[in-house]
Amino acid sequence: MRPVLSVDFNNTFGSLPSDFFVKMNPEIMPDLKLIKLNEALCKDLGLQPDQLREQDGVNFLGGKNILSNQKPLAQVYAGHQFGNFVPQLGDGRAILLGELIGQDGNRRDLQLKGSGKTPFSRMGDGRSGLGPVLREYIVSEAMSALGIPTTRALAALFTGERVVREGPVPGAILVRIAKSHIRIGTFEYFAHRGEIDNIKTLANYVIDRHYPEIRDKQDKYVQLLERVIEKQAFLIAEWMRVGFIHGVMNTDNMTLSGETIDFGPCAFMDHFNIDQSYSSIDAQGRYRFSNQPHIANWNLSRLAETLLPLIDENQNNAIKQAEKSLDAFVPLFTAHWTKVMGEKLGIEDPIDSDKLLIENLLELMQTGHSDYTLTFRKFSKILTSNDNKDWLNLFHHPEDPNLLIWLKQWKKRLKSIPITKEQIAKNLDSTNPYFIPRNHIIELCISEAIRGDLSRFDKLAQAIKTPYTEHPEFNDLRKPPEDHEIVRQTFCGT
């Protein structure tokens, strides 16, 4: 006799006032089938993979079997989208199934994406096509393996439906795990409505859930703002360390927990371009690679505006305090960016003069159209083999004398570091990934999966688990695109 599926939900968001959500079940999908189950994450959450692979478990993951201790709901929020305020957005195709306490003692949301219509769907059908589900599964799990704060993918499912996007495609659901789904846009929703009590309730909830160490502080709302600023400064620098471009940094896509969320038109850079933008809906390049820190700071300013009534009853005093807190973003980001870029050159504790070394390299990469990931990964080989040729050949003009001048300066800087070349090479390989999910490979996986072949997707899902380790069996998935393979635009797919 099979054991009855049991999941220990511990729900708190549903205890907030009803203004925060609509209680509802997901739509029942006709034929749920498992595409991929993240077994390691299952175990981290105290779930049993074997049970979830059974049809009862698949039906649970897809929202068809609702357990008695679940309280599914759709969350409401607003947001600035490409700088324009939308007073109500909300979970238009997502349902929060409940909250779990993981093996580490931390609370996680269990959410479905593509689970049907909600009151916040507007003109949408509440569904997701297979492509966006596979993309988010791959990219979010890659980000996690790269060491970057992110929501996670617990599972991907077929729904048994066909959904119409550019044409008919298989319907799918992503089962997403997050520290929470509270966004800057959640605060904006209540601020726009002038509901200060709800802003306070939400702020207290975020503090209790994510920043309990400031719960009893007299200036806890200022400290809340500052904690989120710190988290986002760190996060954006980490994105840029690996050449990641989010593509749709609206305020409804920025979390209070500091996790990356929503991977619609995201991409990893191939050849380096400081102003690279892939998103088809970002015609002006608002969310281009170089502008991500500025946008994060702009979004945080919108959060600060919502918190002003809590920071000080005197608005002028509140504004001064919020501005002081926001002024910390640029130095925080710059410090972490300099640190991680120094580490990508083998310099563990970069000093001010190293900034020029970093900037000069990026200029050479820009003019030479070198691949972002491979340029940094090959530094360790230069140290261990004393051969520059492979590295130079990454540039369109490997004979450019400025490349050798830069290499000479870099090697001279490394000589001042009191550890062996072998140890520096090891450090380099621990921060410069061997493997990233390339845009053209993701697109190939999606097109093959739509035709019924998931083999390349399965291989890619395996490859992203250990991005800093060399695995020759995945070399076909890590090569930069040929000219005819280059992905020039990415799409939300909603």
For every predicted segment, state its role.
Residues 25-26, 125-127, 222-223:
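Short, contiguous strand/loop micro-motifs
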Residues 252:
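Conserved protein-kinase catalytic-loop position immediately C-terminal to the HRD catalytic Asp
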Residues 31-34, 39-57, 62-216, 256-259, ...:
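Conserved ATP-binding subdomain of kinase catalytic cores across diverse folds
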Residues 12-17, 108-118, 203, 207, ...:
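Active-site-adjacent bridging/hinge elements
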Residues 3-4, 10-11, 17-20, 81-84, ...:
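Short secondary-structure boundary micro-motifs
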Residues 133, 163-246, 256-363:
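ATP-dependent phospho-/nucleotidyl transfer catalytic cores
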Residues 1-77, 283-494:
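Regulatory N- and C-terminal appendages and interdomain linkers associated
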